[in-house]
């Protein structure tokens, strides 16, 4: 009985403190990193994560290779056969450093383009790697910052689209956890879902729909004039809608280099 009470207290205290609105986040399908010059990382990604309007966390799909100036911390990250690295990237000078952390998953062992990454201005308290939900699919890479978890996702395109299954996977991961702290976490999946928001919502199971919300911009996020890039926020056991909104990050859009996706930001209304 005492153990149950302690667990309940921990659960409630984490739930009370958690708030996704404390973060400014964004997602962008980079469509590769312009490997020889890394220009997309050094120009466009840098623009999103530095300066006055910098986001706290950036989810990247088709991340190519990490910037060569990023330094591997050597941290061993347990994962289900999917290599994940933690790197520190100094955006400024050695005398006045401005460091961010890159969590990089080399999903594409051949071409190297279709990799996943999360960039955070804080070091992650924990890293999550969830296996692909379908043959030929990609894993989910996530980090925990305090009481909130953020994932980068890249769903399969066309007929074999696995976007609903990816959302279900995150929901089940936290719902079924034996750790009350994990159960209480708010979570957000950011990425290229390769599916319109309304279509995704229709294909989620009822429990997942009740425990989550889709936060999407009222504009196309790809040159195809489709809205494919957005966020799904939820809590697997104690969901409350958040005052969050999504929109195209137009500053980065104007200077982006050869990606057919636009960066999408999510922040408090």
Swiss-Prot record:
Compartments, as annotated in UniProt: Secreted
Q: Which GO terms describe its molecular function?
A: endonuclease activity; toxin activity
Under which main EC class is this enzyme filed? hydrolase
What Enzyme Commission number(s) appear in the record?
3.1.-.-
Keywords assigned: Endonuclease, Hydrolase, Nuclease, Secreted, Signal, Toxin, Virulence
Pfam families the record matches: Exo_endo_phos
Please indicate if the UniProt record lists Nuclease as a keyword: yes
**Signal peptide stretch:** 1-18
Read off the InterPro entries from this record: CD_toxinB, Endo/exonu/phosph_ase_sf, Endo/exonuclease/phosphatase
**UniProt-reported outcome of changing residue 261 to A:** Loss of DNase activity, no cellular distension, no G2/M cell cycle arrest
Q: Does the keyword Membrane apply?
A: no
UniProt motif (Nuclear localization signal) ranges: 195-210
One Gene Ontology cellular component annotation? Answer: extracellular region
Q: What is its main location?
A: secreted
Assembly and binders: Heterotrimer of 3 subunits, CdtA, CdtB and CdtC.
What is the role of the protein in this entry? Part of the tripartite complex that is required for the CDT activity. CdtB exhibits a DNA-nicking endonuclease activity, and very probably causes DNA damage in intoxicated cells. This damage induces G2/M cell cycle arrest, chromatin fragmentation, cell distention and nucleus enlargement.
Which NCBIfam families does the annotation name? PRK15251.1
Other observations noted: The operon of the strain O128:H- / 9142-88 / EPEC is referred to as cdt type II (CDT-II).
Name of this chain's protein: Cytolethal distending toxin subunit B
Organism of this sequence: Escherichia coli
